[in-house]
Curated annotation (Swiss-Prot):
Localization: Cytoplasm
Record NCBIfam families: pimt, PRK00312.1
GO cellular component: cytoplasm
Gene Ontology process terms (BP): methylation; protein modification process; protein repair
PANTHER family listed in its UniProt record: PROTEIN-L-ISOASPARTATE O-METHYLTRANSFERASE (PTHR11579), PROTEIN-L-ISOASPARTATE(D-ASPARTATE) O-METHYLTRANSFERASE (PTHR11579:SF0)
PROSITE patterns according to UniProt: PCMT
Family matches, as HAMAP family: PIMT (MF_00090)
Keyword set, alphabetical order: Cytoplasm, Methyltransferase, S-adenosyl-L-methionine, Transferase
The UniProt record lists the keyword S-adenosyl-L-methionine: yes
Protein name from the UniProt record: Protein-L-isoaspartate O-methyltransferase
Length: 211
């Protein structure tokens, strides 16, 4: 269920779906997604689907992890990325192998604690975690070259725009209920450019930390 052949089938599917960044594909190939889900779901870890991780949250579909990572890296290497929504830690693990430093914010402490353990097990040590409200970001360590949000916001949080460095890229799902769109926002010299990239389905970005 976690064989190399199973992983290669996933990579082939991602390629067929349009993922072209070889670094992203290589990292997803070698990142053990089965370690980021409950043992009872490990046999489904390399399916291209979201899976429940408890607390009414999910581990994102591999295609969406690849797509969002690819969008973030499209302008070149990044040294400082903020992730909103640590969740299982899978997207965090992928990012940590693609950029120099990851600053990950999660509101549910139980999820974040387990994600920390997984990244330590994988010897991924360029990630710093914050337990807090994702709507606020992490202003004390701003600005960031890239920001990735793994839950849907009803609107783009102004705090995240404020924390984006010049030329920085924000990848975020925006909308409510059934109507959600993936957006790429780039901080330009005279403001922000916004690009709508298609329909998606994410859990909501909620306020307030939970112990």
């Amino acid at each position: 269920m976690t064989s190399q052949r199973t992983r290669e089938r996933l990579i082939q599917r991602l390629c067929e779906e349009g993922i072209a960044n070889q670094r992203v594909l290589d990292v997803i190939r070698k990142t053990p997604r089965h370690l980021f889900v409950d043992e009872a779901l490990a046999h489904r870890a390399y399916e291209d689907t979201a899976l429940p991780i408890g607390h009414n949250q999910t581990i994102s579909q591999p295609y969406m992890v690849a797509r969002m990572s690819e969008l973030l890296l499209a302008a070149g290497p990044l040294d400082k990325v903020m992730e909103i929504g640590t969740g299982s830690g899978y997207q965090t693990a992928v990012l940590s192998q693609l950029v120099e430093r990851v600053f990950s914010v999660e509101r549910i402490k139980g999820l974040q604690d387990r994600a920390k353990e997984r990244l330590v097990e994988l010897n991924l040590r360029n990630v710093v975690f914050r337990w807090g409200d994702g709507w606020e970001g992490w202003p004390a360590l701003a600005p960031y070259n890239g920001i990735i949000v793994t839950a849907v916001a009803t609107d783009v949080p102004q705090a995240l725009l404020d924390q984006l460095a010049p030329g920085g890229r924000l990848v975020i799902p925006v909308g409510a209920g059934e109507v959600q769109q993936l957006m790429l926002i780039i901080r330009e010299e005279n403001g922000f450019s916004r690009h709508v990239l298609g329909a998606v389905r994410f859990v909501p970005l909620l306020n307030g930390p939970i112990a």
